[in-house]
Amino acid sequence: GIRLMTLVVYLLYAFDVINLDGMVVSLCLTYGIATVLNIIYLFSLKKISFKIQPAFVSKWLRKDFILYTLFLIATSLAGNLIPVLNTFFVSGKLGLAVAGINTIAVYIASMVEIPYRSLAAISRPQISQGMKDNNMLEVNSLTKNVSLHQFLASTFIFFLIWINIDLIYNVIPNGNVYDEAKLVVLILSIVKIINTSLNVGATILSYSKYYYYSLLFTVILTITAIYMNIKLIPLLGMEGAALASLISYIVYYIFLLTFVSWKIKVSPLSMRELYTLLIILSLFAIDWLLQTYISKYIITVFNV
């Protein structure tokens, strides 16, 4: 519901039905309505309570709860730093105008993640149950299937985006300004494909007894991202920031998946993904040949 209302607000602003102030007010109303509806729903279930019961939380439970909550907060903060870091470095080193162009590219690339949320929500309860039952054969099989389907879905969306990238920028207002970030869209889309395909490894780790290592790997991701942004943005500009994200996630998943494979004996990677990758690369090669050579030949023939 909230996504649909937000989309409507964005479209109204894009087609000049409302101005910037109207968009801000509309977004505030959208989230306000969603909050009120959630509260009403909770009261209708009669499972919400504001009564404080200190005796319910024992001393050992309180300690574990506080430590685990602090761990989750730290992990979430570190994980959400990467997009903010890129925006911060791009705007700080290249200016707000370039940051705006980069942001549009980020939004276009983020469409690759659309299937991830649904597939991840479906798979997590099954992975959690498998880890609880210590059924590693089932977990390993499920992990590989989830990774493969995430890879297929995200790559399919990326393929649709990339072969229509010029059309997308033509539709966007001032697209002739923003289309200089095409390479950023390409690199960030690859980042999204890697993240959606391999993030099931992080899910496995979070449900295991080694969950606290998640923070270590997230710190590695953050430090790598900061270092690569500092090094690459002055050299390559927006493309440097996108490349910094790509390198950071590659380093992150090398450490993460190696640890998960070593300690938990589970890996999301399989030969099926390699075969799929080869097919996808072949499709991109065909698309490149069509655009670079064959289309020019056809135009030449018809002109003659």
What are these regions (language model features)?
Residues 1-46, 219-224, 238-259, 282, ...:
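Hydrophobic alpha-helical transmembrane segments
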Residues 1, 189-220, 231, 260-262:
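Membrane-interface junctions at transmembrane-helix termini in multi-pass inner-membrane proteins
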Residues 30, 186, 221-224, 271-304:
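Transmembrane alpha-helical segments of multi-pass transport proteins
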Residues 16-26, 38-83, 126-141, 263-276:
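Interhelical loop/hinge segments that connect adjacent transmembrane helices in multipass membrane
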Residues 20-25, 60-72, 87-110, 136-141, ...:
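Interfacial/gating helices of multi-pass transporter permease domains
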Residues 105-147, 202-207:
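Helix-loop junctions and terminal segments of transmembrane helices
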Residues 65-66, 103, 127, 135-164, ...:
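Interfacial transmembrane-helix starts/ends
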Residues 96, 162-192, 239:
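Interfacial segments at transmembrane-helix termini and the short loops linking adjacent helices
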